[in-house]
Design a protein with these regions (language model features):
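Conserved acidic catalytic loop of the alpha/beta-hydrolase fold
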Residues: 87-103
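N-terminal cap/lid segment of alpha/beta-hydrolase-fold proteins
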Residues: 1-26
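Gly/Ala-rich beta-loop-alpha elbow adjacent to hydrolase catalytic centers
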Residues: 108-113, 117
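Catalytic active-site module of serine/aspartate enzymes centered on a nucleophile-bearing elbow/loop
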Residues: 265-306
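Short beta-strand/loop motif that positions the catalytic acidic residue
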Residues: 242-244
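Alpha/beta-hydrolase-fold enzymes
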Residues: 117-204
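Active-site glycine-rich loops that stabilize anionic/oxyanionic intermediates
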Residues: 36-40, 111, 246-247
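Conserved alpha/beta-hydrolase
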Residues: 49-74
Length: 306
């Protein structure tokens, strides 16, 4: 098992960011920075990091605000400007990794982390040598307008900084319907029962986000998709790999990824790759065919970092 090293950074508002890094022997080929999904944490990517390190890559993963062992308020970014803060946090980690290794940085964003990564690319794309988007969504802004309004109402009724099971059920409640009869409420995560059970048993996973996090996330998606539609801020030379399972309820598989790829290409991005894994669910890096996914990721990384 690859041994991780803990690191801390000061955020732009003086909050402390906590993360892990996994380093190869010698100078890395490049650095991969991971932006994790909702209700999980950076340490869940230990296995993926081990495969990347074995191939000569350094890997960094911090815990987004409200996530992980050191969350001040679980499932909460900030009282004000939370979306800007999490994008700025990601910039701090990317800059730290770039400065430490003086090597190209590739950003890997999964699910919620993919939306943060897409916002990062719009604002700071010149810092990236590549972008991997895992289980991302497309044309979410129409739904986001409605859901942000519901989240604002939930904040008024139950508190903006309190975990809100109603919002969790509203957003995720339909995700398991395609897998009935289901063994657990989270069968949509992976076909691998051991991975699903590990997530359920992990005390740092599965917390209910607060209404304020939903307000921040939906507002961020609205602004991010508006910027992508305009296209002028997108870095045209940055290679992008979009990947998801065909049965992922967030990306909607081929449909969602294909539409996003079409938008990126229309904006002038020169290197956009789409991979949809038949039968795969939400976490392809934790799927039954994860060895194939890891091999595909390494092949893509090796190509763009050659």
């Amino acid at each position: 098992m690859t041994v991780s090293q803990a690191f801390t950074l000061a955020a732009s508002d003086d909050a402390t960011l906590h993360g892990l890094c996994w380093l190869p022997t010698g100078v890395p080929r490049a650095v991969v920075v991971i932006s994790h999904g909702m209700s999980e944490y950076g340490g869940r990517y230990q296995a993926l990091a081990g495969h990347l390190v074995a191939a000569g890559y350094a890997v960094y993963a911090h815990d987004h605000r409200g996530h992980g062992r050191y969350a001040v308020i679980p499932g909460w970014f900030a009282a004000h400007g939370g979306w800007q803060q999490v994008v700025d946090d990601l910039r701090a980690v990317v800059d730290y990794a770039r400065t430490r290794h003086e090597r190209p940085v590739v950003l890997f964003g999964h699910s919620m982390g993919s939306f943060i990564a897409r916002a990062f690319m719009l604002r700071h794309g010149q810092r990236l040598a590549g972008l991997v988007l895992s289980a991302t969504g497309y044309r979410q802004r129409y739904l986001a307008w409605l859901m942000r309004g519901v989240a604002r109402l939930a904040a008024r009724l139950g508190g903006a900084d309190r975990p809100n099971p109603f919002m969790t059920a509203l957003v995720f409640g339909s995700f398991n319907l395609g897998f009935l009869p289901a063994r657990t409420r989270l069968d949509w995560l992976s076909r691998d029962p051991a991975q699903v059970d590990a997530y359920i048993a992990d005390p740092l996973c599965g917390q209910h986000p607060t209404p304020q996090l939903w307000i921040d996330l939906f507002g961020g998606i609205i602004d991010m998709e508006k910027g992508e539609a305009d296209g002028r801020a997108l870095p045209k030379a940055c290679p992008v790999w979009l990947q998801a399972g065909s049965r992922d309820p967030v990306s909607l598989g081929k449909f969602g990824l294909g539409q996003l790829a079409k938008r990126y290409r229309a904006a002038g991005l020169q290197d956009v790759t789409v991979t949809v894994y038949p039968g795969g669910r939400h976490e392809m890096h934790n799927e039954t065919n994860r060895a194939q996914v890891e091999a595909d990721l390494l092949a893509w990384l090796n190509r763009i970092s050659a």
